[in-house]
Amino acid sequence: MKIVRIETFPLFHRLEKPYGDANGFKRYRTCYLIRIITESGIDGWGECVDWLPALHVGFTKRIIPFLLGKQAGSRLSLVRTIQKWHQRAASAVSMALTEIAAKAADCSVCELWGGRYREEIPVYASFQSYSDSPQWISRSVSNVEAQLKKGFEQIKVKIGGTSFKEDVRHINALQHTAGSSITMILDANQSYDAAAAFKWERYFSEWTNIGWLEEPLPFDQPQDYAMLRSRLSVPVAGGENMKGPAQYVPLLSQRCLDIIQPDVMHVNGIDEFRDCLQLARYFGVRASAHAYDGSLSRLYALFAQACLPPWSKMKNDHIEPIEWDVMENPFTDLVSLQPSKGMVHIPKGKGIGTEINMEIVNRYKWDGSAY
């Protein structure tokens, strides 16, 4: 299966109203899709995220010339080479070549990987809680209310981007709105030191629905992570920016995390992403993929979760949820899956089992201008 053509689709959307987390406000969303076509006509799609000008030059000047004429079945060696040039671009190539392999074998991605354990995966609604409005708390509450009406039973909201007192006021308002039956995840985006993070423990004794505390500290403080984890009454999660299994090993060896959160687009390809999930199982911790930045990468995270052995024997709580972006973002609909009552059914067709929405691709093509 010789690669004969590669198409690229840089996409851009400027937000109507900025939203954000402890790292600041997002004012736009981007997506970079690729489509690899073989001489037999079999194709596969991939996705990555980064600054669009850098991605586009990287693909057109180096990655595409390198891939043309290569065998699509040589996924591991091709991806390993591209990793040296641009790790996130390598992730897109790995997705596309995985879909080609599945289609060539006349099966789904999950079947290519040995089959799924389950037909549906739980997802949680992921919010960017902060906005540049004095009424940001009420706006956040309204956003959460809207998604709860759609059937989500788990939500993730942001902390660490304003004063501790104001964050507590925000979470109390959400608790009043959502109720204790809704699982709530708190994501600090590495905003605190250990002392500041531990202040939340007082409230965890009151809020019985906290799913986990996400990335409370920078990851250059593993000893503080281990200490904090030992003292908190809720699980500690993190690791969305780790580049592969090797970066998780010291954190897991030191028992820093209860839940690891690899991202398909941040690691060195889909194969290493799956290695991260399996590594968690070997260490006896949970794995819940970070999947905020793309719908195709989220689909691959769902595939991987469907093929992952259960973490527990507890009925209806044996597999970890996957992140689902519910903020303004047209690229969420590039893949036509939608949750129902907080669950997503896994497509069963050949390859990824669904089509990329070309209407969205054509509508949001980046025009090459600065942003």
Swiss-Prot record:
Which controlled-vocabulary keywords does the entry list? Isomerase, Magnesium, Metal-binding
Cofactor binding mode, per the note? Answer: Divalent metal cations. Mg(2+).
Which InterPro entries does the record cross-reference, listed alphabetically?
Enolase-like_C_sf (IPR036849), Enolase-like_N (IPR029017), Enolase_C-like (IPR029065), Mandelate_racemase_C (IPR013342), Mandelate_racemase_N_dom (IPR013341), RHMD-like (IPR046945)
Any one Gene Ontology molecular-function term assigned to this protein's record: magnesium ion binding
Q: Where is the active site?
A: K158, H290
Q: Which cofactor does it need?
A: Mg(2+)
Record SMART domains: MR_MLE
Could you name the domain of life of the organism this protein comes from? Bacteria
Query: Subunit arrangement?
Result: Homooctamer.
Q: What name goes with this protein?
A: Putative isomerase YitF
Species whose genome carries this gene: Bacillus subtilis (strain 168)
Q: What is the lineage of its organism?
A: Bacteria, Bacillati, Bacillota, Bacilli, Bacillales
